[in-house]
Amino acid sequence: MKQKTHKGTAKRVKITGSGKLRREQANRRHLLEGKPSKRTRRLKGTEDVAKADTKRIKRLLGKA
């Protein structure tokens, strides 16, 4: 039986052309008034997934 893609992970992680994994940063959804502008600016954009997690996440996405 084929392994299914883990949809929760698929919605959160994108694979680049070179095979790296990118994710959005946490702490930028709500309650932003109390956070300094410097912090919210720093949290913009995407970040590489930690090297320790890459293998496991690729397996969840069916790309291992």
UniProtKB/Swiss-Prot annotation:
The keyword Ribonucleoprotein applies. This is Large ribosomal subunit protein bL35. Residues 1-14 have a biased composition (Basic residues). It comes from Corynebacterium diphtheriae (strain ATCC 700971 / NCTC 13129 / Biotype gravis). Residues 1-50 are annotated as: Disordered. One of its GO terms (molecular function) is structural constituent of ribosome. Signal peptide: none annotated. One of its GO terms (cellular component) is cytosolic large ribosomal subunit. The keyword Ribosomal protein applies. Residues 21-36 have a biased composition (Basic and acidic residues). One of its GO terms (biological process) is translation. Keywords: Ribonucleoprotein, Ribosomal protein. The lineage of its organism: Bacteria, Bacillati, Actinomycetota, Actinomycetes, Mycobacteriales. HAMAP family: Ribosomal_bL35. Belongs to the bacterial ribosomal protein bL35 family.
